[in-house]
Amino acid sequence: QKSVVLAGDSADKLIVSARVAGGTRDRDGLALFLVDAGASGLTRRGYATQDGMRAADLTLSGVRVAPGDVIGEPGKAYPVIERVVDETIAALSAEAVGAMAALHELTVDYLKTRKQFGVPIGSFQVLQHRAVDMFTALEQARSMALYATMMAGEADPTERRRAISAAKVQIGRSARFVGEQAIQLHGGIGMTMEYKAGHYFKRLTMIDLAFGDADHHLRQLAKLGGLIDAAA
């Protein structure tokens, strides 16, 4: 059983991980297999996600693969999976920065045009401060997204994971802050399906949750830095 496989309902080929040896939590013993979407024993249930993307739940029952469908060395797939996840997080971080930048621009434009008491609401200093706070969070996320991109090719897996987790923490926190501020500063229109702000926020929320949210990666960062062991 595989859950929330992104684009899993439209893919022609699926890369499936499966344990071929060892215990449930062992690093060794995982293998990757290339499975045809039409293979006997494979069923897919596709659905739309909250951000308008597509995913699927897969059930594999008695699926057979040929020796040539094994990807890489059997039993040694964990480091490969780990690296692909890190590279994916780096890519998602860049996407999140783009979404946050669009949300910030959209919000600033709205503050300049929406009027209350006969003046643009952007003339109120407290709202200007909130727009600046959004920009600060955006730039923090941008810096960490660049860092994640730089470190995605790092040969040392520990150093790479530390950098990726640090980036994911900041991306998640910034995404939530920028998204919430954008919705609140827009008022009711920010929550409508017809307006772009809510869609950006949904996508940012899904990016935060993908491959571990900010809290998960903060714990990972503490483990990689030895902070949890030291505290224990």
Regions picked out by a protein language model, each given a short descriptive name:
Residues V4-V5, V35-V65, E73:
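Flexible, small-/acidic-enriched active-site or ligand-binding loops
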Residues E82-A232:
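Alpha-helical interface subdomain recognition
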Residues A7, E73-P74, S123, M193:
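Residue-level signature of the cytosolic catalytic core of signaling kinases
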Residues Q1-R44:
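A short core secondary-structure module
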Residues D9-D12, D26-G29, G38, R54-T59, ...:
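A generic structural signal for well-ordered coil/turn residues at beta-strand boundaries
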Residues T59, R64, Y78-V85, A91:
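Helix-biased detector of long, well-ordered alpha-helical tracts
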Residues F33, L58-L60, M100, A141:
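Residue-level signal for inorganic ion chemistry
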Residues D69-P74, R114:
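Cytochrome P450 core scaffold surrounding the K-helix E-X-X-R motif
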